[in-house]
UniProtKB/Swiss-Prot annotation:
Gene Ontology BP, a term: division septum assembly
EngB-type G domain: residues covered: 30-204
Molecular-function annotations in GO: GTP binding; metal ion binding
Keyword annotations of the record: Cell cycle, Cell division, GTP-binding, Magnesium, Metal-binding, Nucleotide-binding, Septation
Binding of GTP, residues: 38-45, 65-69, 83-86, 150-153, 183-185
Provenance organism: Escherichia coli O1:K1 / APEC
Ligand binding (Mg(2+)): 45, 67
Entry protein name: Probable GTP-binding protein EngB
Any one annotated GO CC term: cytosol
Family listed: Belongs to the TRAFAC class TrmE-Era-EngA-EngB-Septin-like GTPase superfamily. EngB GTPase family.
Top-level taxon of the source organism: Bacteria
Role played: Necessary for normal cell division and for the maintenance of normal septation.
Cofactor: Mg(2+)
Length: 215
């Protein structure tokens, strides 16, 4: 039986800190960060707004691929959520795609305060090549992963469970700390499990301390 995680974190108090085009423009690499990544139409902004119970914390757009910057939000002192650029949208110019990929890869490989990665995938189209690449990057860097199968309300219960079981089976091949859950911003499904996972990461992970060496 699942118990509700006790936490002193109030996600409704999460506030926007800054946007950055790449890792060099981010604030000091200290504390704990949990990043949200996903294809441009995976529902990333909606998930962040649902998590924090704020309608416009993260901008949602009818045009997938609008999030071109790394966006930082503070939950509490030294505890941040990071909205990474959406990837994989066909109509984005090739050069911009490469730029985003570089920024994503650099952030995942070099950001020491990154302790957890939430990868969002449309439950109807999970585990595309770039989704798998994100999970591989995280596992190779010993970063824990939570896969959220979004838009779960689009499928009937039986199909939803089948997709969940299929993806859970598939991610075993990554040989890492990869958990998979269903999520629906519309129905508020899976929000408690997301908060519990974030609570665990923010409370159990070791925060990165300030050092004298700068990059």
């Amino acid at each position: 039986m699942e118990t509700t995680a006790l936490t002193n974190l109030n996600y409704q108090q999460t506030h926007f800190v800054m946007s950055a085009p790449d890792i060099r423009h981010l604030p000091s690499d200290t504390g704990i960060e949990v990043a949200f990544a996903g294809r441009s139409n995976a529902g990333k902004s909606s998930a962040l707004n649902t998590l924090t119970n704020q309608k416009s914390l993260a901008r949602t757009s009818k045009t997938p691929g609008r999030t071109q910057l790394i966006n930082l939000f503070e939950v509490a002192d030294g505890k941040r959520l990071v909205d990474l650029p959406g990837y994989g949208y066909a109509e984005v110019p090739e050069e911009m795609k490469r730029k985003w990929q570089r920024a994503l890869g650099e952030y995942l490989e070099k950001r020491q305060s990154l302790q957890g990665l939430v990868v969002l995938m449309d439950i109807r189209h999970p585990l595309k090549d770039l989704d798998q690449q994100m999970i591989e990057w995280a596992v190779d860097s010993n970063i824990a992963v939570l896969v959220l199968l979004t838009k779960a309300d689009k499928l009937a219960s039986g199909a939803r469970k089948a997709q969940l079981n299929m993806v859970r089976e598939a991610v075993l091949a990554f040989n890492g700390d990869v958990q998979v859950e269903t999520f629906s911003s519309l129905k508020k499904q899976g929000v408690d499990k997301l908060r519990q996972k974030l609570d665990t990461w923010f409370s159990e992970m070791q925060p990165v301390e300030e050092t004298q060496d700068g990059e």
